[in-house]
Amino acid sequence: MVFALIVLAITSILIYRYRAWKNKNIENDGLLEDVTLRSYTYAELDKATNGFLDELGRGAFGTVFKGVIPNGRRVVAIKRLENVVAEGEREFRNEMKAIGRTYHKNLVKLYGYCHDGNNRLLVYEYMSNGSLAKFLFESERKPSWEEKTRIALNVARGILYLHEECETQIIHCDIKPENILMDEHKCAKIADFGLAKLLMPNQTRTYTGIRGTRGYVAPEWHGNLPITAKADVYSFGIMLFEIICGRRHVDMDLPEDEVVLANWVYDCFQAGELDKLVKDEEVERNKLERMVRVGLWCIQDEPSLRPPIKKVVLMLEGTVEIPAPPSPTSFLSSMEVN
């Protein structure tokens, strides 16, 4: 009996020490080197959110709350991660690595973090106009065509920074309207880097078992093929159709031929009936066709047929010609727009 108690006591001490080491590990493994972020205690963020009362939204790994940081009275969005032991810890580390050392006007800015015991929180700039999803699908005032084109360019330029302009190439892996936030000027910014993959300088592809959101993930995810930056291009293409048409990528309440947005867009493009996509909205035909062509190139099943995001930006800006795209699901065409 005494021996059993001694073993139990020793085991408890070892478990305690392991957990303490694990909690400190983020401080000691080089994760925060060269990252100029403010470290907050849980008590500070609890006070900033008034006990986490004002909920802004929920995601797969946690909940976002509105808060006010006393220093400077800055309004912020605070993401409190849940299921920290597994997925939450991974999301925390991914977001810290991905945007802790990046800055771009089309990326949501990360101000600080909390790594206090088992608590994992991230402090972001507050985006007063919510998500692009709410703006497109729930707002009484729908975006104008000018706003749609500006939003599309905002997001494309943010992805361009991640893929080609920041120190470490980043594949976001979860581009969708819910992860695009709008500031007070309706400027769109990319958020939620919990699934992001960082590539080494000599690396162009990666393997990962983690997938983004159904409907936005590129076909190569389903075949367990290498993931490249072209996966983000595919997701952007699906979202671009949602921006153009102001509807979800799948809507079971619509007629059968319109249920899957990407298929319907291609059918309308082939039939020369693009006006069906925007209904009563007044849009210049050439501008609408340009956006549709960009989207159709982005969603090609074959990754090599998709343009790099830099080319996507140029096409959206109207500075390069866009050839007629093949059927997105056709592997017969040898056309490339790279």
Can you name each region flagged by the protein language model?
Residues 1-338:
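Conserved eukaryotic protein kinase-like
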